[in-house]
């Protein structure tokens, strides 16, 4: 059935989700197709997306735990069934969902006897537990048990050297990889000059985001990687004589805007990336951390939205306003700008 639907479309390149299911709170599955592709293109797209999905998607996890006066991670605590090492391994498996950046504090403070699960973690408002039933420890006696935790959003594997900290804190080898697995396959169809390829992409996630969200983020990361090449191609390239280094020209927002003004259809705000706004590194990094990638993303935010961004200051707001006021048409600012 899928083959018949795809084979009928031989002109426009299209993505389509053909299957989506939730196997458990910590296992989401999605199956997508992209077609029609010329011979060889499916492999190119499949390899790039698979690597981006597995290595470029950010996740939130617990990176450190502090127990108090515990001599080493192989110690046992009176009244607790698990050793410190087993508790650390259980904390490592906790799946969190958030859009935070930087390090945040969390804690567990309960009184036994009882089972401790992920539901007992006291989290910042911006962090959510995917599966509250995940086990942490079993208190077998009426004792007070408290753990201080650190939470961080990152990507890939984060390992730290094991040290005996005098304050009783221990690092956790965090795995900030929301995408569990990615498979892709290629199906060829058609005859002669009409032959083309269909890319099938399967994505499994840990529940902190859906396969569709993961695919969108991976695609956006790939686009950001290739933006410098697009700028160089549009503006031309320059080589300095008697030197072995290549210097791409600065692609400014004003030049881009001038070209867009010539377009009778108007200014496609979703095609102007914040990389082109001549912002300071600090302001640019704040916006990127908040998933603001294009001018359309920026203009859809209110002043309150921006000030809620981690490390965003009033000076950054003024810098953004001055930049937009300098380059954008006044009528566009009145219609679109909400801060």
From Swiss-Prot:
Primary location recorded for the protein, binned into one broad class: plastid
Xref: Pfam families: RNA_pol_A_bac, RNA_pol_A_CTD, RNA_pol_L
Written domain comment of the UniProt record: The N-terminal domain is essential for RNAP assembly and basal transcription, whereas the C-terminal domain is involved in interaction with transcriptional regulators and with upstream promoter elements.
Quaternary state and interactors: In plastids the minimal PEP RNA polymerase catalytic core is composed of four subunits: alpha, beta, beta', and beta''. When a (nuclear-encoded) sigma factor is associated with the core the holoenzyme is formed, which can initiate transcription.
Cell compartments where the protein resides: Plastid, Chloroplast
GO MF annotation list: DNA binding; DNA-directed RNA polymerase activity; protein dimerization activity
Reactions catalysed according to its record: RNA(n) + a ribonucleoside 5'-triphosphate = RNA(n+1) + diphosphate
Region (Alpha C-terminal domain (alpha-CTD)): 264-339
Role played: DNA-dependent RNA polymerase catalyzes the transcription of DNA into RNA using the four ribonucleoside triphosphates as substrates.
Cited SMART domains: RPOLD
Name the UniProt record assigns to this protein: DNA-directed RNA polymerase subunit alpha
CC per GO annotation: chloroplast; DNA-directed RNA polymerase complex; mitochondrion
Homology family: Belongs to the RNA polymerase alpha chain family.
Region span, Alpha N-terminal domain (alpha-NTD): 1-233
Signal peptide per UniProt: none
Record has Transmembrane helix as a keyword: no
EC numbers on record: 2.7.7.6
One BP term from GO: DNA-templated transcription
This protein's UniProt keywords: Chloroplast, DNA-directed RNA polymerase, Nucleotidyltransferase, Plastid, Transcription, Transferase
């Amino acid at each position: 059935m899928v083959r018949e639907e795809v084979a009928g479309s031989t002109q426009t390149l299209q993505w389509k989700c053909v299957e989506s299911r939730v196997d458990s709170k910590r296992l989401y599955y999605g199956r997508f197709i992209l077609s029609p592709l010329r011979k060889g293109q499916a492999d190119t797209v499949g390899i790039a997306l698979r690597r981006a999905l597995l290595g470029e998607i950010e996740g939130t996890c617990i990176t450190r735990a502090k127990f108090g006066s515990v001599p080493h991670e192989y110690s046992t605590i009176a009244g607790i069934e698990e050793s410190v090492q087993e508790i650390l391994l259980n904390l490592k498996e906790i799946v969190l969902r958030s859009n935070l950046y930087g390090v945040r504090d969390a804690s567990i403070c309960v009184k036994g006897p009882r089972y401790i699960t992920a539901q007992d973690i006291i989290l910042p408002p911006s962090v959510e537990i995917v599966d509250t039933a995940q086990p942490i420890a079993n208190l077998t006696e009426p004792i007070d048990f408290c753990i201080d935790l650190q939470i961080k959003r990152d990507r890939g594997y984060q390992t730290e050297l094991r040290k005996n900290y005098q304050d009783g804190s221990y690092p956790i080898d965090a795995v900030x990889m929301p995408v569990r697995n990615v498979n892709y396959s290629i199906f060829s169809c058609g005859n002669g000059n009409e032959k083309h390829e269909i890319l099938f992409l399967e994505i499994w996630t840990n529940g902190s985001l859906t396969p569709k969200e993961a695919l969108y983020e991976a695609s956006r990361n790939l686009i950001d990687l290739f933006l410098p090449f697009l700028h160089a191609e549009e503006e031309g390239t320059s080589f300095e004589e008697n030197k072995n280094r290549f210097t791409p020209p600065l692609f400014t927002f004003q030049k881009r805007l001038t070209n867009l003004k010539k377009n009778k259809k108007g200014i496609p705000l979703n095609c102007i990336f914040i990389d082109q706004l001549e912002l300071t590194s600090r302001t640019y990094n704040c916006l990127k951390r908040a998933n603001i990638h294009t001018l359309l993303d920026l203009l859809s935010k209110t002043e309150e939205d921006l000030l809620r961004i981690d490390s965003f200051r009033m000076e950054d707001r003024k810098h953004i306003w001055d930049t937009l006021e300098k380059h954008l048409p006044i009528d566009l600012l009145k219609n679109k700008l909400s801060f």
